[in-house]
């Protein structure tokens, strides 16, 4: 099964900071990770955006 690409955006400033891949069969729900945002200069929640 091919892996699909997606971007992660900061929930505070809405800036798209990270690009990642996932297997939709194993993880069908949207990804939410706490990552560093350079614009906010802090670790914030990042959500999946297609």
Curated annotation (Swiss-Prot):
The keyword Ribosomal protein applies. GO terms for molecular function: structural constituent of ribosome. GO terms for biological process: translation. It comes from the Bacteria. One of its GO terms (cellular component) is ribonucleoprotein complex. The keyword Ribonucleoprotein applies. Keywords: Ribonucleoprotein, Ribosomal protein. InterPro entries: Ribosomal_bL33, Ribosomal_bL33_CS, Ribosomal_bL33_sf, Ribosomal_zn-bd. Belongs to the bacterial ribosomal protein bL33 family. This is Large ribosomal subunit protein bL33B. The gene is rpmG2.
